[in-house]
Amino acid sequence: MKKERLEQAAAFGKERAKKKKNTDTTSNLVPVPKGAKKEKKRVGRGPGSKVGKTAGRGSKGQYARNTVRRGFEGGQMPIHRRLPKRGFTAKFHKEFYPVNLRDIEKSGLTGNIDAKIMVQSKILDKETTLFKILGTGEIKKAIHVIADGFSQSAKEKIEKAGGSIKLRAEIELAASETKK
């Protein structure tokens, strides 16, 4: 009987050890080795600390007392004031996403190509994105492109292949006039 109870207790102890999940407790953590954690240097705390008195700032003067503002050049006229103002920021500037002819050729697009088709073929992210067709690459098949802009070389290459070009703004303008 006693032997059985001892076996049961041993089995129960094993089960209990299995159930124990987290072994990292504050009682069994080992301290980190010396030098593994760099301590912050405390300055200005007396001569025994090696960084007392002037606290690593040298002796007296402007830089020992405080910092100087960004762009300060010691009283000399700073560069942002020496250089003249130039140009202006356009109020209604439009950013065009560049699409090269090689991108159209690589995606295998043919026939009528507009923003919706470009989004489906993952050349553009959104239909509302303004995009300009540029002439890098060659086009072999005739394509009819509706875009927000064309470079001169792209126009020539598309028309040489037997295709046509139209500006999206002109089409939208014509559509709005027909509604009136």
UniProtKB/Swiss-Prot annotation:
Classification via SUPFAM superfamilies: Ribosomal proteins L15p and L18e
Xref: Pfam families: Ribosomal_L27A
Gene Ontology BP, a term: translation
Keywords: Ribonucleoprotein, Ribosomal protein, RNA-binding, rRNA-binding
A GO MF label: rRNA binding
Keyword RNA-binding on entry: yes
Purpose of the protein: Binds to the 23S rRNA.
HAMAP family linked to this entry: Ribosomal_uL15 (MF_01341)
Subunit-structure text: Part of the 50S ribosomal subunit.
Family assignment from sequence similarity: Belongs to the universal ribosomal protein uL15 family.
Protein name: Large ribosomal subunit protein uL15
Organism (species): Leptospira borgpetersenii serovar Hardjo-bovis (strain JB197)
Phylogenetic placement of the source organism: Bacteria, Pseudomonadati, Spirochaetota, Spirochaetia, Leptospirales
Name of the gene this protein is made from: rplO
